[in-house]
Amino acid sequence: MTITPPEQQVKRVRVAFVSNPVETSFEKWSRPGHFSRLLSKGPNTTTWIWNLHADAHDFDNHTTDLEDISRKVFSAHFGQLAIIEIWLSGMFFHGARFSNYEAWLLDPIHVKPSAQIVWPIVGQEILNGDVGGNFQGIQITSGLFQLWRSCGITSEFQLYITALTGLIFSAVLFFAGWFHYHKAAPKLEWFQNVESMLNHHLSGLLGLGCLSWAGHQIHVSLPINKLLDSGVNPAELPLPHDFILDKSLISQLYPSFSKGLAPFFTFHWSEYSDFLTFRGGLNNVTGGLWLTDVAHHHLALAVLFILAGHMYKTNWKIGHDIKGLLESHTGPFTGQGHKGLYEIFTNSWHAQLSLNLAMMGSLSIIVAQHMYSMPPYPYIAIDYGTELSLFTHHYWIGGFCIVGAAAHAAIFMVRDYDPALNFNNLLDRVLLHRDAIISHLNWVCIFLGLHSFGLYIHNDTLSALGRPQDMFSDSAIQLQPVFAQWIQNTHYLAPTLTAFNLVSPTTPVWGGDVVSISGKVAMMPIKLGTADFLVHHIHAFTIHVTVLILLKGVLFSRSSRLIPDKASLGFRFPCDGPGRGGTCQVSAWDHVFLGLFWMYNSISVAIFHFSWKMQSDVWGTVLANKVSHITGGNFSQGSLTINGWLRDFLWAQSSQVIQSYGSPLSAYGLMFLGAHFVWAFTLMFLFSGRGYWQELIESIVWAHNKLKVAPNIQPRALSITQGRAVGVAHYLLGGIATTWSFFLARIISVG
């Protein structure tokens, strides 16, 4: 039996801060590079501006004091949130001032959402298309109108008030950022108190956040949406606070309100089943999730999170201790287990950030999967442009977050990892057998790449030879995704097998009937076949290669056989000095650089798959009980070959963006062209030798010297790392903007 010493049991938690630690002054604003002795001297060469941008937010470079770094990060978070509030306020203001929101509310099926009007300066007013409701503007695909309706916002005046509230909140956040750095700055112990932080974040942010949202949905959103669904004019609705203050009003819609809180305290909770439901599936009026299901979901989450926020030990003797939890995780093959991880996560914010980015990135991709299959807001399911935009948007965010996770994991390894404190724990053991991990992962990538592309090349070859009977397809040699089909069927049967309280399956994707709104498909069963089997293995390949590059960068960031002292060279370095061949582009930063390209590959294939699959097999119109899809179900045959992807998807569907000139969609045509140019321009940075450019610059400088117009600041060619950074940034920018314009011009035209 282990007896805990009494001094370990009592860990007094308090809010520890220092008053007036840093004087408020604008003086530093006028001194670029004030955080570095070298940069603050000003520029001698053009490299100065690059180093300024690279290091301005790298607080580790400014100071080694973890407390000061923590305060800077904490303060910067308030500034970031304030900027987000201003941005959101702008969204609401556009909805109030420049939109057809009220017209859309009256007829969300035929009126398209618009919250942007282009001013006529040199003829750009052509972009203002007729979106219905006697309004001309740019069609938006953000999903904000559908979100606002589900919140219960029924007038543009309410949007003005919300926009103003956002601005006031942003001012409060700016003040908080200044206050907690200059007036009352927390001590390091406050940042490192994980139990208290977990309790407050779980109970406060998530628990009370969900509870307040559930309250809003029950008291405001539900009655307003029920009346809107039944055809009541938004202008004739009672105001939101009327439903809150006048119980008789809401009781007419949901009779259990007349019983008050008695059923709650007597545990007769089923009495509330008129507004807290467990129906599953989609509302057949709006095509969105049942709002009563959504309110129930948030209430359940609130209970879970509020309970979760009471689990961790602070000033009382009960509860979990994170350090204890981690260190008790040992097994027969894991050595010291998680010993040392607590110290890592409380002393390295890069390690903490890495973990959070990996989880948030994965969550964003999960959100993308749910946004189309379980559309959360009314009428969003029949707004195909918005559905496609939200899927793509959440995929990109997920991809960038996951690459960021690898980047900060590598920075942690280089800057914060101490081998002496991590002897024979899980992290040490992973590092010790990194060669086995990477070589196995490499083999998996080769296997997946050869076989997945091999299947396509087989099909391309036999298609060219005119032998369709020998191709892999649903009508010849079938490769059915049997496991995926089994999962679909299991979910479809859930109400009769596992979830007896559920009225219907969670989404029509699993099987069942088509859900259509005014003759337009909202969602329907998605059949999977050989074509999906093939492209899913391309997904597996691209994702595994991305992981291979990123994980290799992390595991070899401190040392490798080639450069045993890599840790001393830092997170990013071009080469290990002159005269050492083969040591260029092996830094952890270079792995992030390469990982970004493969992340781009992974996401492009996934969003292309989604776009084509939905147009082919889901989206369309219902006439005489028959579904007519946008591309007539051509995915199952067209996507079996690489040639088919090029011909039937990229080429066939780019006609709208290429022919958009002279129409309200012409901006997408120009963006498509411009983004291709930006993308192509990056190849000059990515395939280029620095020496060539430096020589060219020297000769241009020589000419300037001859004419006595030489600059004081010497021009320098970009370093290898700078060139790669500029290259990858614009490669991704060009690629994303090309895809964006291609998708939107297409789906707005045909959707």
UniProtKB/Swiss-Prot annotation:
One of its GO terms (cellular component) is chloroplast thylakoid membrane. [4Fe-4S] cluster binds at residues 575, 584. It catalyses: reduced [plastocyanin] + hnu + oxidized [2Fe-2S]-[ferredoxin] = oxidized [plastocyanin] + reduced [2Fe-2S]-[ferredoxin]. It is a multi-pass membrane protein. Disulfide bonds: none annotated. It is found in: Plastid, Chloroplast thylakoid membrane. The PsaA/B heterodimer binds the P700 chlorophyll special pair and subsequent electron acceptors. PSI consists of a core antenna complex that captures photons, and an electron transfer chain that converts photonic excitation into a charge separation. The eukaryotic PSI reaction center is composed of at least 11 subunits. This is Photosystem I P700 chlorophyll a apoprotein A1.
